[in-house]
Amino acid sequence: MNDLKKSPLLILDFGSQYTQLIARRVREMGVYCEIYPYHINHEQFKKLNPCGVILSGGPSTVTHDANPRAPQWLFDSGLPLLGICYGMQTMAVQLGGQVHSSALREFGYAELRLHGHSQLLNNIEDRILADGSALLDVWMSHGDKVTELPPGFKIICETRNAPIAGMADESRQMYGLQFHPEVTHTLQGLRILQRFVVDICKASTDWTPEHIIDEAINKIREQVGTEKVLLGLSGGVDSSVVAALLHRAIGEQLVCVFVDTGLLRLNEAEQVLSMFGRHMGIRIIAVNAEDKFLTALKGVTCPEEKRKIIGRTFIEVFDEEAQKLTEIKWLAQGTIYPDVIESAATSTNDAAVVIKSHHNVGGLPDTLNLKLLEPIRELFKDEVRQVGLELGLPHDMVYRHPFPGPGLGVRILAEVKKEYADILRKADAIFIEELHNAQLYHKISQAFAVFLPVKSVGVMGDGRRYDYVICLRAVETVDFMTAHWSQLPWDFLGKVSNRIINEVEGVSRVTYDISGKPPATIEWE
């Protein structure tokens, strides 16, 4: 098999919130692509040997000279180019066209009328009018617009407010689209991207789960040889897929450490040990560190501080176990491509605000002196799941809802105590069980329970009592950047509430969170 990463498609990032979505759409076609900052070095670009380039959108305006531009040498590369939104505008300006701020901005749905023939949009339409005009339903998000074409370009589509909504120089295979083909609101968006990537760029479509696994196994064996590898196994999707992949590649050379923090979901430790230890035969060192974590968290209520303490304590426990394993030479991690993109700071926003600390950011101590192995660092989450299924992991494990690294520690809105964790664990398990029973679990993106540190009066039998409040949260989202609260049936919520109040001692009231993201985040802390 040829190198899957030979001649990738490149996406140059101008800071759009949709840049990773472009890459995911391209990967869905079976095409390998990578994201780089818009100011990529020319030598690095040449070494990558791309088959084509997409210029992403971005929050800036090309009407200011100081704002980002594509490298000028890119337009002399001879490669097919597609500019999306800001990418189209900077292409237009840099090649001699004009862009101005528009009095009529376009945000949201727009009806697009195609102009004549273009290789990019030919025979792609949502409907055709009686006069033969082809129309597309697209998603716009722009305040500037191209007002004058660069030399050699023609108009390929228009909207009521943007007479130049798309442009093309067919001879140089350069294209610009003012709308966003990568979002699902543009109904034919995937076909448009596929036309550019596969038909115009002639990209290879060998990027499939089977080929990804084959290449990863070969690379792991080549890197590791006969040496042993250590993996921190959490039971999450990423570390589970890494465990299965490494086990297939190197068998008994893999050693896993599983840390029970006391902040896991109900029966989670037993499920992980059963699946990977007894069922798959992987060597797992299980550490019950509940007391250590609860002691470290005593008296702490600040969410950010809780995250840092949980992360620091995890590293201490893991380090202590790793130091006992003198034969280990490699440390495996479940780093995935979005982590790589963020840590490489490909975003054009230099001043980033820390919204929440992630417990595993920063890695393990240098004193371990281990070589790093990251076998899924080039995969998006949806690709990780596909690889997991191909490796034979259970569907319910691979498509389990996201669970935060700090676990229940950030779903207890107070000091973390064993009493609170036990209450929350049971309530959460009931919620998830009922979602499965009602066949709703896989229709929503994430669901969980939150422990609220307030007591509410309740009536149990003939007596009044004050007990704690549980809040249920369920959201639907495509990318977790924005989310809608899930409109679960009232009778379903009533059933869950009754079960929690009757079966979980210490709970007198259950509420349901109907906040979207934004303004709220998905997790409460």
From Swiss-Prot:
Pathway membership: Purine metabolism; GMP biosynthesis; GMP from XMP (L-Gln route): step 1/1
Gene3D superfamilies associated with the record: 3.30.300.10, 3.40.50.880, HUPs
Keywords attached to this entry: ATP-binding, Glutamine amidotransferase, GMP biosynthesis, Ligase, Nucleotide-binding, Purine biosynthesis
HAMAP family (UniProt xref): GMP_synthase
Protein name: GMP synthase [glutamine-hydrolyzing]
Enzyme Commission number(s) of this protein: 6.3.5.2
Free-text function comment from the UniProt entry: Catalyzes the synthesis of GMP from XMP.
Active site residues according to the UniProt entry: C85, H180, E182
Residue stretches making up the Glutamine amidotransferase type-1 domain: 8-206
GO cellular component: a single term: cytosol
Subunit record text: Homodimer.
Family matches, as PROSITE patterns: GATASE_TYPE_1, GMPS_ATP_PPASE
Gene: guaA
Pfam families: GATase, GMP_synt_C, NAD_synthase
UniProt superkingdom: Bacteria
Domain GMPS ATP-PPase positions: 207-400
Keyword Nucleotide-binding appears in the UniProt entry: yes
Residue sites binding ATP per the record: S234, G235, G236, V237, D238, S239, S240
InterPro entries: Class_I_gatase-like, GATASE, GMP_synth_C, GMP_synth_GATase, GMP_synthase, GMPS_ATP_PPase_dom, NAD/GMP_synthase, Rossmann-like_a/b/a_fold
